[in-house]
Structure formats: structure tokens, C-alpha cells
């Protein structure tokens, strides 16, 4: 993690502009072709949810602007963000939030996430003040066409919130809607486009 020198930061003017906005957050929703991911997890007997969480995390960390954070009034560039996933408890309508680093490949991450989820007995199992997270969730019961998230009113909140819905058939391909909610002080449409391109390319390469 390194502190950003705002006097020479290429984003300083935009950061100050959006810092004056009372609600600098926005959300976009787009379609993702998950045909190859669906095939891959079926062949490898992996969780689609955890596998997508792995790929989403990789795509987030590939775009520098997603890794900016505010700490103690200063702007910092994080080394990486860590996925924090909502996960339904087996046989229950209640969920808990599973947080773990993205290590190894997809299969290793899926196994680690499954083991941690099974062992976790509380809603949270991490430092709630940690702002290097990615909030990840899924609504597999319906197609997602838009999403907003609960939050405290804090313009310094820089945690990306990423949610996707149920996949379905579209012209012989499996696609789903994905919502990404971000802070405009750091992230513009250009950066969301880079995230999408990386995610789709990684899925297509499976």
C-alpha cells in the first residue's frame, strides 16, 4: 500500500470535483456472457458463485482505480482488494459474510471459500473497519437488471459492491446481469469498462 501524493496525482481535479457532491456513488448494470464459466465449473465440479467471485476479484484488482482508498484523510493505493461474499447457510434463509484472500487458482479458492463458510458460525468473521474489501453478492432467484446497496452515509466509503443475478439462455449463450456500485471520486465509466473487459476476457479464456 502506498500513499498518493495528491499534488501530483493525475486524478486530483476529478477527485476534488466529486468530493463536493453529497452522494458520489453510482451503479451500473450490464450483461456478462458466462457460457464458458458455466461449462468450466460443471466439468470441474466447482461452485459457480465462488468461481465468479474469484474472477470478479481478479478483474477488480487489475484496474488501479478500484484499489484507491481513503484512510485518515489521505488517499492510498491498496496492493489488492479482498473478496467478502454473502453466503446462505445450508438449509436456512439466513446468510453470513465470508471473507478470505484470493490465493491460488479457481479450484483452490473455491475449496477455501467452501471450508471457511462451513466453519463460520457468526455473521461476520473479519474486521468491520477494513476498507480493502470487495462486497460480493448474488441473487440467483431472478434476473438482475439493477441494484443499489445499503450503506452508512460516508462519502469516504470506497468499497466496490458487485452483485449478479440468475443466468439464463440468450441466443444459445448463458448470460447474466451484473451490477457494480462504486464511488465516482475514484472510478469513472472508463474504469468500469476496463473491469468488464478483463472479467469477460478471463471467462472467455476458460
Report each predicted region and the residues it spans.
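Aromatic-residue-lined binding/catalytic grooves and analogous aromatic/hydrophobic interfacial grooves
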Residues: 3-4, 30, 40-44, 59
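Short amphipathic C-terminal alpha-helix that caps PH/PH-like domains
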Residues: 56, 110-117, 195-203
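Flexible, Gly/Pro-enriched loop and linker segments at secondary-structure and domain junctions
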Residues: 1-29, 124, 132-138, 143-175
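Active-site-proximal acidic secondary-structure segment that organizes catalysis
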Residues: 156-206
Amino acid at each position: 500500500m502506498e500513499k498518493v501524493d495528491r499534488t501530483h496525482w493525475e486524478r486530483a481535479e476529478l477527485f476534488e470535483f466529486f468530493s463536493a457532491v453529497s452522494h458520489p456513488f453510482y451503479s451500473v448494470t450490464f450483461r456478462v456472457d458466462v457460457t464458458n464459466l458455466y461449462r468450466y465449473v460443471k466439468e470441474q465440479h466447482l461452485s459457480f458463485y465462488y468461481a465468479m467471485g474469484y474472477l470478479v476479484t481478479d478483474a477488480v484488482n487489475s484496474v488501479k482505480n478500484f484499489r484507491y482508498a481513503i484512510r485518515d484523510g489521505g488517499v492510498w493505493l491498496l496492493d489488492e482488494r479482498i473478496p467478502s461474499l454473502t453466503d446462505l447457510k445450508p438449509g436456512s434463509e439466513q446468510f453470513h459474510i465470508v471473507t478470505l484472500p484470493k490465493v491460488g487458482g479457481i479450484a483452490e479458492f473455491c475449496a477455501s471459500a467452501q471450508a471457511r463458510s462451513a466453519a463460520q458460525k457468526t455473521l461476520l468473521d473479519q474486521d468491520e473497519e477494513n476498507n480493502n474489501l470487495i462486497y460480493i453478492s448474488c441473487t440467483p432467484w431472478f434476473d438482475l437488471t439493477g441494484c443499489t446497496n445499503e450503506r452508512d452515509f460516508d462519502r469516504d466509503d470506497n468499497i466496490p459492491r458487485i452483485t449478479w443475478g440468475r443466468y439464463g439462455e440468450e441466443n444459445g449463450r448463458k448470460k447474466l446481469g451484473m451490477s457494480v456500485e462504486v464511488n465516482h471520486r475514484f472510478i469513472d465509466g472508463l474504469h468500469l469498462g476496463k473491469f468488464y473487459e478483463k472479467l469477460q476476457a478471463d471467462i472467455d479464456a476458460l
